[in-house]
Amino acid sequence: MKVSYHGHSVVKIEANGKVILIDPFLTGNPKTDLKTEDVKVDAILLSHGHGDHVGDTVELAKKNNAVVVAPFELATFLSWQGVNTHPMHIGGSHEFDFGKVKFTQAFHGSSYIDEENKTITYTGMPAGILFTAEEKTVYHAGDTALFSDMKLIGELNKVDLAFLPIGDNFTMGPEDAVLAAKWINAKTVVPMHYNTFPVIEQDPYQFVEKLQNCTGKVLEAGESITL
């Protein structure tokens, strides 16, 4: 399994001959190296409905005939836009031809914000994502605060690689993320959701230096880890 980071919370996984994208915020993302027109994808996994995570999902899904796996309300909302979706909910898992997906808790919001019409559409509960393929498990925490049930994620799963938000303000900051890493007990931890905007500026190298009992790795956009 090859896992690459593409800025903000964008993660690409190549496994079982398939390409999976998590939270494909490409257009308007100053930290990504990916261009929508160049992306080939078989499946898109979404943690929640905010624009900096749904991003280019509709365009990518339609262009590639990709399935979008998302929390139920968000999946329904996207299906109304002509997207092929597979709805799930927190605690549920499903075996796809590209791998197994399980949604975990995340403490955050989830909505579609229409700035022009000044409306906010509820898109269900936010989620974290456990993805398992080729006997390896990746945990993408989505946007979340620290919460004690992260201990359960670590107890019930053998996490090989975890992506944790460290930006603070909208998610947990570096100090809380250090504790999250301890509870999740992943072999390797990569920081995400930082330095995209001024309000979430952080030093990822200081974060990884504080990690205990795991390997911390800062990935620049386009860099990858092979599991």
Swiss-Prot record:
Keyword Manganese among UniProt keywords: no
Keywords, ordered alphabetically: Hydrolase
GO function terms (MF aspect): hydrolase activity
InterPro entries: Metallo-B-lactamas, RibonucZ/Hydroxyglut_hydro, UPF0173, UPF0173_UPF0282_UlaG_hydrolase
Pfam families in UniProt: Lactamase_B_2
Family per similarity comment: Belongs to the UPF0173 family.
HAMAP family: UPF0173
Listed name of the protein: UPF0173 metal-dependent hydrolase BC_4613
Species of the source: Bacillus cereus (strain ATCC 14579 / DSM 31 / CCUG 7414 / JCM 2152 / NBRC 15305 / NCIMB 9373 / NCTC 2599 / NRRL B-3711)
